[in-house]
C-alpha cells in the first residue's frame, strides 16, 4: 500500500517584513511478497522564517509603543526620520537611542532562518513460521538550520552583519 501527502503553510506576521512559510511531505510505502514484508517511510520538511526583532529594549514593538503617534516616519526628502526621537539623545548624537523609528527598524534589518528536516525509515520483516518473525529497520533523522542576520548601517545604532551555520557532524554518514 501507499500513503502520500503534502502540506503548504504561509502565514504573514503582524510586524512589517515578518512571515513564516513551511513545505512538508509524507510518504509511506509498503509491500508484501509471500512471507516477506518491506517498506519505507519518508517525511521531509522545509521552512523559512523572516523574523523581526520584537523583543525587549530596542525592538520594533517597544519602539512602536514608545514613539508618539505625531512623530513622522519619514522626513520631507523621503529618508527615515530619526530626529523626532529625543529619548536618550545627547545633542545631535543618536548613537545612544534605545528607541528608534520602528518602520525603519523593520525595513532595514533582516533575520531569516531556513530549516530543513528529514525523517526516514526503511524496514523489512520475514515470517519464518507462525509466531516467529524477524523485523529489521534502519531510520534516520536530519535537521539543518541556517540563519542570516543583517542590520543596515543606515540605522543610527551599530551596523552589523552576522552569518552562522550550525551542523552536527556526528549525524553524517557515507
Labelled PLM ranges:
Residues 1-3, 37-41, 123, 127, ...:
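Membrane-spanning beta-strand positions in outer-membrane beta-barrel proteins
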Residues 6-10:
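Transmembrane beta-strand segments that form the barrel wall of outer-membrane beta-barrel proteins
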Residues 13-20, 24-119, 135-174:
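Surface-exposed loop/interface segments of Gram-negative outer-membrane beta-barrel transport/assembly proteins
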